[in-house]
Amino acid sequence: MVLLLGSIVQAEPASDTDLSSAMDQLKKHILGVSALEAEQINQQAAIILERIDRIGATADRISQAFDLLACQERTVGPLFLNEATRGGFPRKSAGGLELDRALFTVQQGLIDHAYTPDHIQKFRSILDGAAFKTSSCFPGAVDMPSGPTVVHEVAINASQPPCWGIPVMDNETPARRPTGCYLAPGSIVEVTVPPSMVGKGYGIRVGAHSWDLREKPTIVRLDRVSIVYPIEAIRTAVANPLGGGIYIEVPYRADAGIVRVSIANAVRAPFFSARHFDRTTLDQWKKSERRHPGPWADFESDKFMMQVPTQWIYNFDDPVTLMEDWDTAMDAVSELFGLPPVRCKTVLYLQVDVIFRGNANYPGYPQSNFRYDPLKAESGHSNHWLLKGPQSSGEIIFHELGHAHLFTKFRGEVEAVVNLPYVAVLNRGFGVDLDTAFGRSFSKPYVSLEQAAIMWMVTENFRMGRPMDISNSPANEVRYQHRGYGKYVEIVRLFGWKPLQDFWHSVNLDYLKGIEYPRNADPTDSRILRMSRAAGADLRPLIHFWGVHPEDNAALEKAMTKEGLKPSPLIYDRLLHYRTLIPMNNAHFARHAEIVNPKGIRKGKNPLYGEGWYSVWLPKYEESHGRAAQAALQEIIDLYFPEGRPKG
């Protein structure tokens, strides 16, 4: 405390004083009153960062922070829109942009610490109308609503029932339900919900882009742009200085059912609903829904959801077929893994952003592996493949969705069999022939099942009767390769999709009985037996051929006999056919190499895989290698079919 004219007044905490002083010095620098050197700006930025949790604590600090930002926006221009920061800038300073980084910290601090339920009420007069002008870049510009008296009423699914079967990634996190409403930057929206949702873990999310980008080396938008307000009363006031779509977060095991939510002082955004309880008609879409001004559009069914920029879709004509196609793909995935077609939340949730959320493609809720340029002019009818449907180009999406399903695998298959879902989508969902579906599932439509088998049979490991290499090295013969999951597609070719569906369904049933299998190292012999049980045939020779050998073949054979699982003539015939495909001279090998490397084979690549491996073997492969491969395959045939072709 300090004494002032005989009165006792409460002094600002030291942290507030330092924070205020730092922001004041930055403002004076912007106005040219007291110029700072780069290092001095960095010093003030460090003080702000250290005290950032106090930036939303008082009316004075919030007002000062917005005043500082407004000063910068008037003088230089908003972040990501001014000349220096358009398109983003490096997170680590290499000289220059010191002030921009400091103001980035201020903006992020306001979002993180000023926009809380208590502060919206306590500092409403300050926050009402307070907006970041960078919002015109991301998430997008939109005019303020016509007035708080305009109320939109929407239906949402306020239930998220318990999941059935083995755990799936993000199944127990809150489900996100679009409302078709958008909060304009600077506005305060009031959301009214039924009493059944109060104090039950529900929330209101403003801004769909929920991934935290703080680890990204390049800053292209604020790291955290989405704010969640817990629903603790029938009416909740929400705000976000960037604006954002309004969503209801439904907690796991919530059971409020279909409810109606009222939203006041928001603008509408395009929302195509293919949900069972609320379907947007094509006429509604064309005449009104796609024309709403909110900068992000939502598409949602009971099985699939995505957000894309409104600039992509305001002339898009047929979301009905699009969503039917996405639902078809979701059904193919659910059937493959023996899961119900309608789950506790959508099977897949996709979101476009200005940057990948990770340093590569990742699964997630949402899966955010799709970039756009917010400053690029669009025609309202984007040719992005997300709007062409999953049959267009979905191999990456379904690879990541495979990871998200946490299903059981043989050892070493983690980065191989996750491509299988897209084979099912294309073949079972859209009637693409199996070979083409297999090839496209890992972006190489020229790799058929037979070519994948040859890619395995020409290796030294096959000739020597060894399993496929699953080491963590470039010599690995399974990960990111068609031959690594060819065994599953082979089962489909011979027996149809049902054995795989029944197998993974049995894994779910076992889980419900308390029996769990290691998802990335399912015991080999147990897995072969259970897969054989689902196929109604002894799959040992087929799986052995594809590089996974039984650990105790004698014991496994007894188990097969005990269950009446007999050798299959289909497998026998297939192995004999593969014997005829083995290249028997250098010319045959060269033709195979050309097929699986259609762009040519360049020298200088790693000699242990891919082009590099073929570059090494092109001059070396000869008849002796072909004969050794034939002998190795004959050993497999003799081991499992000692009496020749089975009857049947």
What are these regions (language model features)?
Residues M306, L449-A555, G564-S568:
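Active-site-proximal alpha-helical
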Residues E12-I30, A35, A131-C137, N520-G648:
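Beta/coil-rich, acidic/histidine-enriched accessory regions frequently appended to metallopeptidases
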